[in-house]
């Protein structure tokens, strides 16, 4: 889908660039596939802030999206494409031949009326799901499982994808967009194609209020706070912080590695590219 550029008729429309969602379904989601959703405001069960700068926003309902795609050898038709407030990608409502409805992540180049299917061996066509071991090398995939039957975990955000670059000894070699090359069991499911809405990264909100509608509150820098609030705070007049950048809790940031080693590190052939 394309981008919408606005004429600067008001200060808030100047420079605004939004996603054109005119082709998406405009009604309500399927009721049996949705659930009410309470807002946390970034607080945990003790009422303490665990994620800063969250709160408010439009009321949302959660859509149950099928990340497992384990209904094998039953074809489904794409009924409609929908907006989902819980993720950056669009979702597709599919109807199986036996009448069951489900939501899946909408891949690019899939439109209303297309047929998709999951199975041990299916056509390599956007929207079809199959084990990585059954796909030809070079296939572009998304919604990749890390454990068999656990549902897709990798490449689920708008416009993302991974590439199957090799197969060896029961494992598939998958190259992620970050540059990481890792091994995934060949029995793990993945969906062919890239995730929809690749222009999501090119949006420009245009005004603070649009971020507030999404539940994002203003993000404040540490150097403008008081010493009680942040290690960079305080000082007479404007200061540059006076120390190497740290988080509000004193942990070094901006390039400092915080990743904890784990058993599955042995499945990573090449690490993702450094941010520097």
Swiss-Prot record:
Q: Give an example GO biological process.
A: cytoplasmic translation
- GO cellular component annotations, sorted alphabetically? large ribosomal subunit
**Keyword presence, Cell membrane:** no
For this protein, the record's PROSITE patterns field holds: RIBOSOMAL_L2
Q: What GO MF terms are annotated? A: rRNA binding; structural constituent of ribosome; transferase activity
Q: Which domain of life is it from?
A: Bacteria
Q: Which SMART domains match?
A: Ribosomal_L2 (SM01383), Ribosomal_L2_C (SM01382)
Q: Enumerate the residue ranges of region (Disordered).
A: 224-254
Keywords, in A-Z order: Ribonucleoprotein, Ribosomal protein, RNA-binding, rRNA-binding
Signal peptide residues on this chain, from the entry's feature table: none
Give a yes or no for keyword Translocase in this entry. no
Homology family: Belongs to the universal ribosomal protein uL2 family.
Query: What the protein does?
Result: One of the primary rRNA binding proteins. Required for association of the 30S and 50S subunits to form the 70S ribosome, for tRNA binding and peptide bond formation. It has been suggested to have peptidyltransferase activity; this is somewhat controversial. Makes several contacts with the 16S rRNA in the 70S ribosome.
The record's subunit annotation is: Part of the 50S ribosomal subunit. Forms a bridge to the 30S subunit in the 70S ribosome.
* Record-given protein name: Large ribosomal subunit protein uL2
Question: Which species expresses this protein natively?
Answer: Gluconobacter oxydans (strain 621H)
